[in-house]
């Protein structure tokens, strides 16, 4: 997000603009995909033009650069897929797209390189401040810490309210999406929004950095803090509203659908800083859209607050860069041949839809904070993200995971925890019955 939508003067507006400005440099330093494609907010009716003008003025006050209200041929020149009957649009040339998985993994790997230790699939059950430090009770034991940073998403209010005198409330707001095949990839060049409402920015149509088209989301307040299931009603709503601003959207090219949750705080504002009535307990709560765009600025802000409170010094040995996984399909033929001669695993295609090699999958597993599940591999190198959604490559990826992790195939999970994909090996089961 460029930063034109958040209320002027809010922390959300400030950090959105700052984060968006930092993202290109961060993409270079941490080697993740970033594309400055620009965004449009489309006004279909003259009666709504005042709303578009207010959005434009709001963006100017927020410090968003290059904003322009466009019409007619100028609008069609920027994005030919916008409906010809569109009255006007707000053009934000600083709008951009990234892969959320790519950014998250890049940050995690860089953190690991700088000494951060990760403990996954662990739930906090209690928090106590005693002896000048925090005792964090989890379902896997006790952790002692000088400070706690609460970035628990839809659970951030639960942890905050365990310790703070000032309570907060977060509502999980579900958004359902559809993803279109690469074959539809050229349908739009820009991220096309509809005029926003109090629930969000409407159903967008946007390219992804990997060449797909993404359509969504809905905005439904729910009670389930983990409720990421899709629904027929939600997907029908996406389908109905998707082509309001664009014409001829090829929805027959949908290859998957999914849902995510926004951690909506009642005041619709980021809560960042020390929690009231606590010592060294810090919140990053209510981080909903534009949270992804704001992430670099949020990270900087909370690190500065914590450093000041704890009198921390800068790490002189900090490693600021990270090299991502080599993508064979992005190399020239000569470069591919050199790499394959060095490591033959890069000559074996495992995921045909996305042209992902065994070498890339092995790298994803062996790296710091490496993949430990089918989804872990998928989110790092996209094996299983293509047209067949893992129908052909899942078993092969599982075999590579089992080999690299020295684990049984039956222990490989879809996404960690107890999400096992098979109950046992057929040959072993047959032999067991033969001995009865």
Tell where the protein language model's regions lie, with residue ranges:
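Iron-sulfur (Fe-S) cluster-binding segments and ferredoxin-like electron-carrier domains
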Residues: 226, 357-368, 391-409
